[in-house]
Structure formats: C-alpha cells, structure tokens
C-alpha cells in the first residue's frame, strides 16, 4: 500500500464473527512477558504422537479443541492444557499421530473465555482458516521438489521484478488458461490468447523478467472460500493466517493439503522457467483487531496502542503490529524463514515496512540470507500514519542505510517521472513537466551521493539516503493508485494512446537504465489499464484482469519492453553495485533545456563491454538537439525503438533526440 491507498478496517468483512471486548492489559505487564524461542510452536508430530504448544503468558487457562472436520461439526474432544510459567507456553499431547484432524485453541483471560483460534502458527487450515489442520508435510511436496532451487541473481540490482496478482494474470476469458485465478495457472506452459500471442508463464519467459512479485498469497480474510462461484476478488492486504497459502487460489480450499501442494507446484514451475518468486508480506497489521489470532492468544501483546488503550494505526487499516516486542519480532523473522524453507520463496516485499523496526528488518535480512544468499528483500519505506515507534527506529527509506540487504521503493523517481501519485492530473518529466530534472538525476544514481546531483532541488527527498544502489527499487507504478496507462490518460487528456504509449516507453526506459533494481507492474508491457480505478483492491475481474488481446494490438509496446529488459540484462553498466562506482562512472551533462536529462556512463562501468554509454531523456513534445562526443557510436535506442545489438550508427556531434523518447548510444 502507498500512504494514500489504504483500506479501512470496515472494508475487511470476512467470514469471522463480530468482535468481542478484550481485557485491557497494562503495557508494562505485556512488556514483561517472557520471549519463547523454541521451535515447537504450535504443533509438532513425532514418533511419540501429536504435541500442541501455545504461547499465551497472560492466560489463566487454555483449552485445546479437536475436530474431525475443518469447518463443520463440534469438537470431538477438549483437552485442558498445562502451563509452563517460565516460558508462558501451554502444552498438551496426544499419543497418536492425528493427521487429518483439525484443532483450535481457546484462551481464558480476565475471567472470560475468548473465542476459539487456530493460533498464530497454523501452517495448514480448513476452509476459511478457522481451524488449523494436522497434515503430513512430506505428502505436500510435488515430484522433484527436493531438487528445486532458488533463482540466482548475484546482486539485488541484477533482479528485474514483475508485480502480479494471481487472478489478474489469468482470469480474463482470453488468457487461454484453464485454471484461472489459481496457483496452478502457472503450470500451463504454452497458453495463448484468442489472437495467438503467448500468455501466462510463457509470456513471462518471453518478456525476460527474473522475478515475479506476487501480491499476498497467505490466507487472508476477505474472500469466502466456500462461495468461490461468486468470483470474489481482493488484493489480500488483510492477513488472517500468515503461514498458510490462500485457499481461494487453490482448486479445493476444503482440502488442507491442496493449497500447500499447489502453491509449491507454482513455485517449482516458475523456478523451472528461471523465474524467482517474491512474496508480498503484510506483517504490519491484521484484518481483524480484537478478533485476530494474535489477540485471541495473547491480547494486547502483538500490537501497539495509544495512551488511551486503543490501537495505534500507522497502517491506516485499524491497527499496527509491534515488531519491537521480542515475540513479535521473532514471529516475523521465523515466518519469512518458514516460507523461504518450506515453499522455496526467493524474496520478500514488506508492505508498509516502516511500521517495523530497523532491528527486526536486519534480522530478517540476515536470517533469510543464511538460507538463500541471493534472496531479494525490499519494502515500502513509509507508513500510512503516525506510530508510537520512534522515527529513528522505523524502517523508513530515510533509515535504509541502517539496514543491511534491504531495499526501499523510490517514490522520488516514481513521482518525478510520471507525476504525483495521488494528484491524478499532475504531470511528470515524461509528460512535459519542468522542474523534475534533478529528481530524475537522483533516480539515475539510485539516491546515492553524487557530486553533480543537488539534492536540495529534489521533489521528495532532500539528501542522499542510500549508500548503495542495492538499497533502491525503481518504479513508476504498481498495484496501488492509478496504473501507468490510466495515469497518462488522466494527466495527458489532449494526447491519444499512441502518444501515451510512447511516453510510457520513456518512463520505463528511465527506470530500467537507472541504477538500482527495476520493478514493473503486470500488463504495462501491453499497455493495460484499470478503467481509471485508482484503488482496485476489491474491484471485479472486469477492472483488474489482464486483457491478453492487447498484446497483439500493442505488440510494438511489448517488443520495446522486452528489448529494454534484454539490454539491461546484457549490460552491467546499468547494474552497478556501489555508490563509489556510480560517482566515478556517471557524468551528467549541463543541459539548458527543460525536461531533458543527459549523462554518460564511462570506464567500462561494472565490467561492461561498452566503454561508454550516452543516455538522453527528452520529456518534451518536440525534438531537442544535444552534443555528443564525436566518435563511432552504435545507436541502441532512438525515437521510441530499442535494440541492444544496434539500430544503426552515429558519428556523434550535434544529435537530435526525438520528442518523448530516450536516446541511448554506445561505443
């Protein structure tokens, strides 16, 4: 979510019953709870039987309810659990392996029994996630899972990230995909649109991206998994069970094994295609407050509060979690490690990451990279409101230099290039708005210090907050706010789509030639729109689904994106890994024209075969002339076309740059 695209708690109307009143526990008492770091929460099965362990230090009693069904019927047995006062963990065991059964916990606190909960560590659930399931995970692995491996990008700047939603990508009637909106849509290898263009996973391979960033795939609250015939839609930023795949993306949500196996099959299929999987994680808030699994196990502990006892709300969604408390910090770290190990997830995108503390994010980075050294980790370096967490401890973009191996989205390049994210008619550099040149330069150098960049003239940040380009994710649009097509239609009403597509190419050329890691939103390579809807989090498929027939209609646009990606992958000059290299190798030209940025990348930067690259961006609606050093140049991009192997030759000197386009020369 961006700071303007937030959903009220009232929007989260899932299948959970109405809230109950929880006891108010003093902050000092919550802070004194023991932190338990054992690996046996909340379910283990071994040769001796099935063991249950719930961390609930403030509970007066805890019951374990056992069920034969994941959704219907009463408990066939209730067990009183025993407390270990030193750890705050309540335990119970059964002498048999209870595979195929379901369970919930129920906590008594303040003299009252709270509602039942599957706990916070459920790894398998019944339909709608109200009861945890006991499964044999060895039976969830697809054939060949043991040899499945992470996708290797030696540096984060080598990644090219493509953001997508399961339904958006496959739901349209012309996708050619049978399992629309499902994990297993990615298992269909050679799907085609009505007019014969590749779709699905074949499209991703043709485009050339290295990673897909998939919107929330854990079990979320707003889709009723018993009513999927209704074609419900949600982005999923309303977490219910953090460690279980979302059932609506499986072919049988009532089968606890199905969603687990099918998500693994999706990851495996993408890995076989050479594409890594980045999981969008939303540990900053929960869909429910008093009725969340956190609240029903340890009321008050997992959240931050205002002095009056109400939830603080830096998420804009009704609550915010307290990563600065030991058990919550451990939870976040162990949860992402679980996804990395069990599901072979290649990376993580943290929603509203600045709600979390720097220390927790550093733990995430270190411990995930101990599993996969090539993990891609990034997040939104902002909040949607104020937080009790001190500013200096927040994982803000301004604090990114305090974090190791964690990147933040650059709202600097986003707003400078296309126009302000929330002012829909505001223009940016690519649509002819003067005064954005210095902020574009900030984007080019990945917000690192550079002797020719004046941060005081930046539109957003006023200092070089990144100490490495690997700390920056460059983008112009994502699932939030208007997609790029709709933004250009709103801000350039006088233009036609042919002109807007040209402007979109320039925008993405700035992103893909800038230092840092490029990130793009699904479908923009074929100029998809969302019919002007700026917050489509619960809009139907008619708004969100990719119309794959656009690929043939806008084939020139797709080919430009594909060739742009190929150029970046072939040339490490665009993927430097240190601020010192950027400062040494990038030289900006003095330009008098508005909406023009011109620079050179010199010295075989980052081991590139090109000794020098000349890059010029022209956001004007007219051509401009720039001076290029005389010599033998290959024209790589010009007048809305691009080819890493060359479009032609140039001798330099006075050179024309066509309107709303990029010029790239190499020698």
Spans of model-derived segments:
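Conserved, mostly hydrophobic/aromatic
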Residues: 54, 105, 164, 214, ...
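The feature marks proteins involved in alpha-glucan
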Residues: 21-49, 84-188
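Substrate-binding/active-site clefts of carbohydrate-active enzymes
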Residues: 167-343, 361-372, 376
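Conserved alpha/beta catalytic core and glycan-binding cleft of carbohydrate-active enzymes
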Residues: 132-135, 365-366, 371-527, 537, ...
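C-terminal beta-strand-rich structural cap/linker in extracellular carbohydrate-active enzymes
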Residues: 56, 100-103, 647-667
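Sec-dependent signal peptide cleavage junction
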Residues: 6-21
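Catalytic cores of secreted or luminal carbohydrate-active enzymes
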Residues: 552-578
């Amino acid at each position: 979510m961006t700071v303007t695209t937030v959903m009220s708690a009232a929007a989260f109307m899932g299948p959970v019953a109405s809230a109950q009143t929880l006891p108010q526990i003093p902050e000092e008492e919550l802070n004194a709870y023991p932190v338990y770091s054992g690996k046996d929460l909340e379910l283990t099965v071994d040769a001796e039987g099935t063991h249950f362990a719930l961390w609930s230090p403030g509970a007066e009693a805890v019951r374990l309810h056992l069920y034969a069904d994941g959704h219907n019927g009463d408990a066939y047995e209730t067990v009183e659990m025993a407390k270990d006062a030193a750890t705050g963990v309540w335990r119970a065991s059964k002498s048999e392996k209870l595979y195929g059964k379901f369970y919930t916990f129920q906590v008594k606190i303040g003299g009252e029994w709270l509602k039942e909960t599957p706990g916070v560590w459920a790894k398998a659930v019944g339909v709608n996630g109200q009861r945890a399931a006991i499964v044999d995970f060895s039976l969830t692995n697809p054939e060949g899972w043991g040899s499945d491996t992470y996708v290797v990008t030696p540096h984060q700047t080598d990644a090219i990230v493509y953001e997508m939603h399961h339904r958006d990508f496959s739901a349209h009637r012309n996708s050619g995909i049978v399992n629309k909106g499902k994990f297993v849509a990615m298992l269909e290898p050679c799907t085609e649109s009505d007019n014969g263009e590749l779709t699905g996973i074949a499209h991703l391979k043709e485009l050339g991206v290295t990673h897909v960033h998939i919107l929330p795939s854990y079990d979320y609250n707003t889709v009723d998994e018993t009513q999927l015939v209704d074609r419900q839609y949600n982005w999923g930023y309303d977490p219910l069970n953090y460690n279980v795949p979302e059932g609506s993306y499986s072919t049988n949500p009532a089968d606890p094994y199905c969603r687990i196996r099918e998500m693994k099959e999706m990851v495996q299929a993408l890995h076989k295609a050479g594409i890594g999987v980045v999981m969008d994680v939303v540990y900053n808030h929960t869909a429910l407050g008093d009725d969340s699994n956190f609240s029903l196990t340890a009321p008050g502990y997992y959240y931050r509060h205002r002095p009056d006892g109400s939830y603080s709300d830096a998420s804009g969604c009704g609550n915010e979690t307290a990563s600065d408390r030991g058990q919550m910090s451990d939870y976040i770290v162990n949860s992402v490690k679980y996804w990395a190990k069990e599901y072979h997830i290649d990376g993580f995108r943290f929603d509203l990451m600045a709600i979390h503390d720097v220390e927790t994010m550093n733990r995430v980075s270190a411990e995930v990279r101990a599993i996969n050294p090539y993990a891609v980790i990034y997040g939104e370096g902002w909040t949607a409101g104020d937080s009790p967490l001190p500013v200096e401890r927040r994982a803000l973009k301004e604090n990114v230099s305090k974090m190791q191996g964690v990147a933040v989205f650059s709202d600097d390049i986003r707003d400078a290039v296309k126009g302000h994210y929330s002012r829909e008619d505001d223009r940016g550099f690519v649509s002819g708005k003067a005064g954005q040149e210095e902020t574009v330069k900030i984007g080019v150098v990945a917000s690192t210090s550079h002797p020719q960049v004046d941060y005081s003239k930046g539109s957003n940040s006023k200092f070089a907050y990144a100490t490495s380009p690997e700390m920056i994710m460059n983008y112009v649009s994502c699932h939030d706010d208007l997609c790029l097509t709709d933004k250009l239609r709103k801000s350039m009403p006088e233009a036609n789509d042919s002109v807007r597509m040209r402007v979109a190419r320039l925008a993405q050329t700035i992103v893909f030639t800038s230092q840092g890691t490029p990130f793009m939103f699904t479908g923009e390579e074929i100029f998809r729109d969302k019919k002007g809807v700026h917050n489509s989090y619960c809009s139907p498929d008619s708004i969100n689904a990719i119309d794959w027939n656009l690929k043939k209609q806008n084939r020139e646009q797709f080919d430009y994106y594909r060739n742009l990606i190929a150029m970046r992958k072939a040339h490490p000059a665009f993927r430097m890994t240190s601020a010192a290299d950027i400062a040494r190798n990038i030289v900006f030209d003095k330009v008098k024209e508005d909406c023009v940025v011109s620079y050179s990348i010199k010295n075989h930067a980052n081991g590139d075969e090109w000794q020098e690259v000349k890059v010029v961006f022209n956001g004007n609606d007219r051509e401009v002339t720039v001076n290029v050093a005389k010599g033998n140049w290959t024209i790589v991009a010009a007048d809305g076309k691009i080819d890493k192997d060359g479009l032609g030759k140039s001798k330099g000197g006075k050179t024309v740059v066509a309107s709303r386009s990029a010029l790239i020369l190499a020698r």
